[in-house]
Each structure stands twice: as structure tokens, then as C-alpha cells.
């Protein structure tokens, strides 16, 4: 293998391992966030059964579905997240070579910053094309509030993918893809762009104390998450449309979804579960720091 291939493989492995560990740790928070986002568009959750907030959700889930249901959809998430995050990190460095080749970060700061934004956004969008059906399945599995057996909408990852494919074809597995690309570019641009720029401004980036790295990463993930959150809410709502027919369809398209959420639920609805997303972001910050630490030893 060439040095470039070895470097790419190390990026892929380091990013994937770090992501799988952190995602499993924050899976319960992830499920709470998803339920708060999509409950209004769920056929299983009637108006009188909707969760009132994070605490209500955390209390009711183990009572109604069992403690292990906090990790519902986590297997799909780990399977999805390993290639997603690994590809993001690997492609990010490849895109950095394209956008930042010959750019001096000290004398061309804004060009350097723009290059980091572009490389981060392009990496996220590229990865999404490959793993979107898994992201879709993870959302639908996490949104399934049936207790067991016949009450469940899907029996697992394979059952979810097969049922939606039979019902709606490949298009059903990519429901909400366009708004996802918009959101992922905004999120990844901030996630990678600001983080790399901030670290690049430090005197000795490679030997930065882990606490400083974590603080930078925590700020970046919180800002990036809140900025792109409305896009995430809309894409999750669109994912809930797959498998529906006739009058069961709530939104005719992405623009209709934006309009109806704003009209019927108000602007706050775009940020349902946002606080749990900030908590979940601690896992994202941990990924960035862990990735840098793993790379030091590879």
C-alpha cells in the first residue's frame, strides 16, 4: 500500500472506532431527541400520548417500552455511523488538500477559513449519499414506540428497509434527502471548519492539551447543532412519510413540511429536542478529541 492509502485507512479506522464508542454511549439521549422531533408526525403517538418534554420522555420510555428500548435503533445507528463518520473524516482530509492546497493560514486567514468550511461541507454531503438509507432506518426504528411483537412497526433494521422498499421503492429510503444535504453541509461546515480553524490558530496544534481540545470541540458541536437543527427536524418529519398512502400523508414535500410546521406548531417546533441535542453533542465533541488522540498513536 502507498503512504496515501495507509493514511486514508488510518483516518477511516480512527474516525469509525471513535464514533461507534461515543454513539453507543449517548444512544438514550439520541432516542429522546428523535421522539420529540417526530412525534407530531407519528401514526403510533396520538395527540393525548405525546411527550411533554425531555423529562417526560425519559420517565415514560422505560415504563411503557422497557429500559432497553432507550437503545432502540442503536444497532442501525452504529452500523450507519461507522462508515458515515469514518468517511467524513477521511474525505475531509482529501477535500482539504483540494481546497487548502498552497493556502497559508497565517497570512490568508479568511481563505483558510473558507477552505475549511468547504472541505467540511463537501465531506458531509459526499458521505450522506452512501449511507442515507441506514440513517433513514435508524430514525424509523427509534421512532417506533410499540412495546413488542405486533405493536412494533418494524422488527428490526432489515425488516424496516424491506417494508419501506416494497411500499415506496428506493425513493422511500431517500425521503428527505434534499433537505438532509442542506442541513449536513451547514452542520459539517461548522463542525469541521470552525474546529480545524481554531486548532490551526493554536501555537502547537498537535500537542494541544486534551481539555482545550474538548472545550473547542464542545463549543463547535453546540453551535453547529443548533444552527442546522431546523433542517434536521424537517428531514426527520419527511422520513416519517415513507410507507404512507393517501390521506395518511402529512406533507406533500419539503417546502410544505416547513410551511405546515411553522403554521400549525410555531417556530419553536423546529427546535423540539434541541436541548437533548446539545447534550448529545458532548458525544460529538468526544469523537473529535478521541479521533485526534487515536491518530497520535497510528
UniProtKB/Swiss-Prot annotation:
**Which residues of the sequence carry a binding annotation for ADP?**
80, 92, 235
Any one GO molecular-function label of the UniProt entry: ATP:ADP antiporter activity
One GO CC annotation, please?
A: mitochondrial nucleoid
Solcar repeat coordinates: 6-98, 111-201, 212-297
At which residues is Phosphoserine found? 7
Q: Which residues cross the membrane?
A: 8-37, 75-99, 110-130, 179-199, 211-231, 274-291
Q: Which residues carry this modification: N6,N6-dimethyllysine?
A: 52
> Which residues are modified to N6,N6,N6-trimethyllysine?
52
- Name its GO BP terms in alphabetical order: adaptive thermogenesis; adenine nucleotide transport; B cell differentiation; cellular response to leukemia inhibitory factor; chromosome segregation; erythrocyte differentiation; mitochondrial ADP transmembrane transport; mitochondrial ATP transmembrane transport
Q: Which residues carry this modification: N6-methyllysine?
A: 52, 147
Query: Which residues does the record list as N6-malonyllysine (modified residue)?
Result: 23, 92, 96, 147
Per the record, residues carrying N-acetylthreonine are 2
Recount the PTM note: Trimethylated by ANTKMT at Lys-52.
Report where it is expressed, by tissue. Answer: Expressed in erythrocytes (at protein level).
Q: Where in the cell is it found?
A: Mitochondrion inner membrane; Membrane
Catalyses which reaction(s) = ADP(in) + ATP(out) = ADP(out) + ATP(in); H(+)(in) = H(+)(out)
Activity regulation remarks: The matrix-open state (m-state) is inhibited by the membrane-permeable bongkrekic acid (BKA). The cytoplasmic-open state (c-state) is inhibited by the membrane-impermeable toxic inhibitor carboxyatractyloside (CATR). Proton transporter activity is inhibited by ADP:ATP antiporter activity.
Region (Important for transport activity) location: 235-240
Give the signal peptide as a residue range, or say none if absent: none
The subunit structure is: Monomer. Component of the MMXD complex, which includes CIAO1, ERCC2, CIAO2B, MMS19 and SLC25A5/ANT2. Interacts with AK4. Interacts with ARHGAP11B, thereby inhibiting the mitochondrial permeability transition pore (mPTP). Interacts with TIMM44; leading to inhibit the presequence translocase TIMM23, thereby promoting stabilization of PINK1.
Q: What does this protein do?
A: ADP:ATP antiporter that mediates import of ADP into the mitochondrial matrix for ATP synthesis, and export of ATP out to fuel the cell. Cycles between the cytoplasmic-open state (c-state) and the matrix-open state (m-state): operates by the alternating access mechanism with a single substrate-binding site intermittently exposed to either the cytosolic (c-state) or matrix (m-state) side of the inner mitochondrial membrane. In addition to its ADP:ATP antiporter activity, also involved in mitochondrial uncoupling and mitochondrial permeability transition pore (mPTP) activity.
Q: Which family does it belong to?
A: Belongs to the mitochondrial carrier (TC 2.A.29) family.
Domain notes, please? The transmembrane helices are not perpendicular to the plane of the membrane, but cross the membrane at an angle. Odd-numbered transmembrane helices exhibit a sharp kink, due to the presence of a conserved proline residue.
* Protein name in the entry: ADP/ATP translocase 2
Species of origin reads Homo sapiens
Mind giving the lineage of the organism this protein is from? Eukaryota, Metazoa, Chordata, Craniata, Vertebrata
Q: Which gene encodes it?
A: SLC25A5
